């Protein structure tokens, strides 16, 4: 709108000169000719201007152009305004719109207000009718237009006029709020009562291209034109509003910046008045800090070199911040070796026992490691790696060791790390470079001898950005980590005093070179008895504290804890058990706050369904009896042991073996070995049977769960033997062990977990490989005392104990080489 106002105040000469059309007024457009016709009027050219009928306009012209204009109009002071559409490049031809308006000169006065300017005249003009130009003619050296009047359709009712005028006025007032110095024009628009007059006043202020204004002029209906103008005004109002809002925000931001600058200048003046000004340049401050830090020589030289670079940087230079961050990192790191406190073995034992129940072998190994440290008094030696299922206390053991040694505790999770730079850091040439997690951990510790737990090191993966496990080799190797090189620091850092502890769920995902540098300590699954003690001594107390309760508010009975362990959790650790206890605590908290129940609130086994819902886990129980072809085996899983039923049936066929239940290759091979042993060892027993005309189908239930491993060998053998001899096996008997083709029973792993699972499921007798009998030392006494264990060396012993079969001695054929050669052709 403001630009249109400025254009309105331009003289006609200035307007023509500004838009480059003065020289084109005397040009012969291609459509001109010298034919005379009636209804002709001279043409007045006003570039970049579209006017509506009923428009009043004032022009300031110098004397020459005033004379030209007066010669152009007819005797009635009428002329036709046409607006050039485009200028064809190269030939100077001008193309005009076909529709224009008739202009009438109302008055002409000389402008005498400014005597310093050249002589000018003020012309008052009135736009009359809209016309269609048929031809453009040249007559007496001037251009004329042959035209016809285009009547406008004005069928507006009084109500429509009132409504349209109201909408125009309201929109104009809204726009005027955003723009300064528009009161004069706003009052002029509001003062018009006729819709066409109002449109004529608003039209010059529309911020739309010339061709769009021409389209509005060419509309026949005044009503449609008014509606379109209102729509354009509303769009213009929204656009101006957005611009003003952005300008307001920008202005506010600039004001805040100016305010902050002003306050800083004022502070500087105040400090100068109080002699508080610190004119010490940054590089001098850093030099003093580096000197006071007494860094190692190599590190000090590197830091001073960076300070020298800082001196050359200009103020607010991007490189300056990079150097400052580097120097701050150097100065925040601990460089001087701490004197390690004397290791109190008695205190360490007490700390471990207070924080963790059970884990006897693990605690013994940790204490042995600490005693070596106490005697050696220099490097820590081997790096400990705790391996075990989730929730068995691997990470918390590291925290207990830190407390026992009175050292800082730092934990870094490496799960999901697939970039070597996460360990070694990024080079400072990269934008946003940072040191690696090891150096950041040391900065956090503040000392050179923390207990540093590297959590989930088996969860690291290799990617295009390198292999982080390879970077850990230098960190965890006692022969190398006294000069660990971080890409960000670019100076060696001594990690030899750090007590590194790693944790992992599985050894399979740890590369051999890294595993070779670690002292592996395996943590087994907790037994139900151990879980019960942990819940009593640790979990319930922690949950009560977390929920703002005390032992006087909530009691959980012994049977309820057992039920939680057996029927609501199925895990190797105790995290799930703690979640269930927390759910009980939330329930009781609500009862106390809302219902004001009597305290202590006692939760027994019968209340668990109302609090926790249906049982969430189920353990298989042995049946009263097994049919022939069904035998109970023992299995190891990441969450502990379990019993495993193996089933077999005979089918008509050709002595083929069919296996189902998602069995792995090793387990399939064990079944084939079992079948071969049955054929060789039971040949005498089966000589009268039709076993050779039968297929054997073996299935292991829980078909959705993959199963593999050699420990089901004896169970598969016994299952087939039970089937073909039609002899059932005692349902309270279970077994585990690998078999060889020679009929040997070989040792397997996971004996502790398997035996505990057997006891939980009601098994009374377990057949074990003879070499695994020593592993029963790890089984809790309360479990061993309820069961009978029988050592097995051969499959013959297994079949005798399970089925009562006495097989003949397995003797090799006594045939000499000479006898074989005699019958060989």
UniProtKB/Swiss-Prot annotation:
Superkingdom of origin: Archaea
Binding site for ATP: 388-395
Record domain Lon proteolytic: where: 625-805
GO molecular function (one): ATP hydrolysis activity
Compartment list: Cytoplasm
Catalysis performed (reactions): Hydrolysis of proteins in presence of ATP
Swiss-Prot/TrEMBL induction comment: By heat shock.
Functional note: ATP-dependent serine protease that mediates the selective degradation of mutant and abnormal proteins as well as certain short-lived regulatory proteins. Required for cellular homeostasis and for survival from DNA damage and developmental changes induced by stress. Degrades polypeptides processively to yield small peptide fragments that are 5 to 10 amino acids long. Binds to DNA in a double-stranded, site-specific manner.
Name of the protein described by the UniProt record: Lon protease
Lineage, top ranks: Archaea, Methanobacteriati, Methanobacteriota, Methanomada group, Methanobacteria
